[in-house]
Amino acid sequence: MTPSAKRRTLNTHYFMPPHVRVVELMTSGNTAPEIMSLLVDRMKTVGLKPFVAKRESTGFIQNRVWASIKREMLHVVAEGIVDAQTADDIFVETIVRPGTRPFAAMDYVGLDTVANIERTYAQERHLDTTYTVDYLQREFIDVGKLGIKSNKGGFYPPSTAADAVSTKPRIFVLDNGLSGQIDNLKQGKILEYSFEGEYIRTVFKDQYLPDGIAVSQEENVLFWTCMGSPGQKDGMIYAGKLDGNDIRPLIQQGIVHTPKQIVIDEANKKLYFTDREGLCIWRCDKDGSNLEQVVVTGDNNNECDRRDATRWCVGITFSHTLGKIFWTQKGASKGWQGRIFSANMTIPPGETAAHRKDKVCLLEGLAEPIDLDFHESTKTLYWTDRGEMPFGNTLNRLRFDDRGYALHTDSTPHLKHEIIARKFHEAIGLKIDARNEHVYVADLGGSICRCKLDGSDKVRLVFQEDRAWTGVALA
C-alpha cells in the first residue's frame, strides 16, 4: 500500500441490530487526522453516532469492554455461583435498565473505595493492578480526585459528576397505526425512544388501535389498552414485559367497549382505565381480576346514551394525597362540551358506581379534554386538550388546596385554569416525570414534546409524520 493510501485507510465497526446507530472509528496507525474528522462529520449527517478510538486496540472500544464482561459472566456461571438466566437478569436490572454509566458510577461510589474493592479482587485472584489500582492511585487518589465527594471531581468534572449518575427516563409511546396506509385496524405499535428522542426499538406491534399505556416500575411491565372497533364491545387490556416478551391479555374481548387511558395505583396494586362507549371507569387488580366499575355515566345498552359524547370517559388519573380520582368527559369533537370530574377513590357506603353523590364537576365548557396526570407534591392536575384554538391543542393545569378544593385562577382570560403550553397537533398522551420536573405530551400529528412543569422550555423530541401517537409512558 502506498504512503498516500495508508493515510486514507482506517478501521470501522458497525453494530447490529440496525437500530443501534453507533459506529466505531479507529486509526490504522497512519490515518490522516483530517480523514477521521471528515468521516465523523459525514456520519453524523446521516444519523449515525460515531465514536473514535484514540489509538489501535483489538476489539475497538465496545467489544474490548464487552469481552471483559463476558469473561466475568462466564466465570460466575462456570464457578456455579449463579445460572445464566439469573446472571443476565441482574445485569439488565442493575446496569441496562437504569442506564448506569461505569465511570459516572465510580465517581459516585468514590474512587478510593473503587481502588480498595479492586485491590481485594486482585489479591484474591492474583490479578495485575497496573491498569486498575495503580492507575487510580497515581492519576486520581494521590492528587485528591475522589469523585463527587471531592471538589476536584474524578473522571468527570465536579459540576457534572453527580449529574452523570442521574438516570433519564426511557419513553414508551403508542402509535395507533392510523397515520399511514390503512389496510386494517391492527397496525398499532408500542415504540421506545431515548430521553433525547432517539428511536430505540419497536417493543410490540400488530395492536388493535392502542390508546392508553402505563409502566409498572416495580415489575418492569407495560400495561396498555386497545380500543378495538369504535362502538363495538371488543376492546382489550394487555400486559407485557419492557423487554418485549411475555405479552398477555388481562381483559379479553366481549367485556369492555372502548378502553382509553390507563393508570396504575401501585400502592393498592390496581389498574384504572376509562371505557368511552362503555360510559364508565373500571378498576381491577394488576392481573385483570376483580374487575369492577367505579363510575358510570350512562346506560351503555341505551343507543342515545352511547352516542352522547358528553358521557364519554376518556382520561383518568388519581391522587393519593387528596384521595380522589379525576376523569375527563370530552364531549363532541371540537365541541366545547368537555368536562373534568372528581370523586373519592372509594365509593361511599350505600352508593353505587352509577349513583355517587361525591361526584364533582370541576370544569366545564372545555374544548376537548383528553388525558390526565396528577403531580402530587404540588397538588396539580394536568391534562391535554385536542380541541380547537384558542384553548384547544394545549397543555393545561389546575391546582388544589390541602382539602382538595380547586384553586381557580384568572391567569388565562375567560378560564378558571391555566394553559401552560400551546400549538400541539391533536394533543393526546400525557405523562409527568416528577423526578426531573418534566411533562411529556404526545399528539396524533406525530410529535412527542417535553416541557417543564410550568410549560416553559418546550422542546419537540420526536416528529414523525407517519406516526399517530396516543398514550405515552416513562420507565
Swiss-Prot record:
Keywords assigned by UniProt, alphabetized: NAD, Oxidoreductase
Entry keyword Cell membrane: no
InterPro entries: 3HC_DH_C (IPR006108), 6-blade_b-propeller_TolB-like (IPR011042), 6-PGluconate_DH-like_C_sf (IPR008927), 6PGD_dom2 (IPR013328), LDLR_classB_rpt (IPR000033)
Deletion consequences: Significantly reduces the production of T-toxin and decreases the virulence to maize.
Enzyme class: oxidoreductase
Residues given in the record as NAD(+) binding sites: G99, T100, R101, P102, F103, A104, N245
EC numbers on record: 1.1.-.-
UniProt xrefs under Gene3D superfamilies: N-(1-d-carboxylethyl)-l-norvaline Dehydrogenase, domain 2, NAD(P)-binding Rossmann-like Domain, TolB, C-terminal domain
Any one Gene Ontology molecular-function term assigned to this protein's record: oxidoreductase activity, acting on the CH-OH group of donors, NAD or NADP as acceptor
Keyword Transmembrane: no
Binding positions (CoA): K149
Superkingdom of origin organism: Eukaryota
Pathway in which this enzyme or protein is active: Mycotoxin biosynthesis
Pfam families hit by this protein: 3HCDH
Coiled coil, from the record: none
Biological role: 3-hydroxyacyl-CoA dehydrogenase-like protein; part of the Tox1A locus, one of the 2 loci that mediate the biosynthesis of T-toxin, a family of linear polyketides 37 to 45 carbons in length, of which the major component is 41 carbons, and which leads to high virulence to maize. One of the PKSs (PKS1 or PKS2) could synthesize a precursor, used subsequently by the other PKS as starter unit, to add additional carbons.
Family the entry assigns: Belongs to the 3-hydroxyacyl-CoA dehydrogenase family.
Protein name, per record: 3-hydroxyacyl-CoA dehydrogenase-like protein LAM1
Top-level taxonomy: Eukaryota, Fungi, Dikarya, Ascomycota, Pezizomycotina
